[in-house]
Structure formats: structure tokens, C-alpha cells
Amino acid sequence: AYVVQVMNLALLEDFDHLYRYADLLELERGIHAERLVGCYTEIMPGRPTIAEHRHPRDSVRKPISAATAAPITKLNAAIITAAEQQTMNYYMNIGTFYDSDLGRRLYQEIGMIEEQHVTQYSALLDPGMTWLENLLLHEYTECYLYWSCVEDETDLHIKKIWEQHFEQECSHLHAAEALLKQYEGKEACQIIPDGTFPELLRFGPQKEYLRKVLKTTILNTAVQDAPAIPVETL
């Protein structure tokens, strides 16, 4: 429940970012973003950007325990941390080259929020894991993502590409397993106890879930000891 609260908080903030970039896209290019997201997601206001800025300490979350957390929880934390890191890097480094001042300012503003998100999600990761344990989990995460793409892909040509990448990541996973055993005397099953992937990722509509989160948490914010509290209680 704690991790879900953490993710739902930033979900509404990224929902706001989607809305603002969609507005910019239509304003400057005349392109309707609904076509690009396949109508899986509604493009509408989320938590306003101006309400997303917080004190740095209020973005630090409690870490999960790699020893007791469910495999899907560890995967979710690893996936969202990597995704937010890439997003932040893109906004902060590439956004400055956007061809309009309006767009550059939007990238800069939202890039600051993405930096908060990177702090929030990376704080969920277990700081007690060793470098090689993290390497194993990293490779396992990539295998999980590629296999999800394989199973969900409908274009046979693209499916073969996902399969090729999955096989490559499996070899990386075996290499990480060997390093863990050689240098730390640990078995992979100590980090990944189940050889079967958790429920795979699927691309599909999530409108109802987003509406529910919007309805129940739109006025929430975060403080150091709580990932989601009503603003009115501050």
C-alpha cells in the first residue's frame, strides 16, 4: 500500500505533464495528442504543476526491503526509477534545444519536477543491496520488460526484435548470476526467489484507474514521513 501511494502521487503529476505537453503539441504543431496515445489515456488536467514543488526532504521515501518485498514490487520500483531518470535527463539536456521559448520554459519547469520524482522513486530501492545484487536485479528487470513486449506484441516483425533482445538480456542475466556467485558466494535465487515472472505488463486502457486516482487524491501532497496527505491538513 505504501508503494502504491508513492506511485499514485507522481502519477497525477505526470498526468498533468502529459496534458501540458499535449497543449503545446496542438498549439505549435496542430497535432492532437489523443491520436498518439491510442485513446488508451484521457488527456486532461491532473495535479497542477505549481502545486508539485516540494521541499527536497519531502521527496525522500522509505526504502523497500529486498528480502521481504514481492518480486513485482522490486520490479516496479526499478522500472519507474529508470524511466523517470531517462525522462529527467531528456527534459534537462535536450529540452534546452527546443525551437520555441515557450517549449524550452515548459521543459525546464517540468524537468525540476522529474528530478523530484527520481529522488522519490530511487529512495524506494533497498540501499542495503550490493552492487552485484543490483546488477542481477537490473538484468532481471530488463528480461521482464522484453518478455512483456514479446507476449503483448501483435506485429510479428516487431515481435522478433523483442525476442532477440530478450535472449540477449537472458545471457546478461546469466553473466550477472555468475559474478554474484563468484565474488559474493550467493545464489541468484536469494535475490530472485521465483523463476517465474510476475504478471506481465500489458498495453491497454487505464482510464477508469486514472479517474479513480484523480477523484480520490487530486488534492494530496507529500511530506517527509507521508507519501500522500491532503493539502488542507498541512
Describe each model-derived feature in a short phrase.
Residues A1-L234:
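Non-heme di-metal
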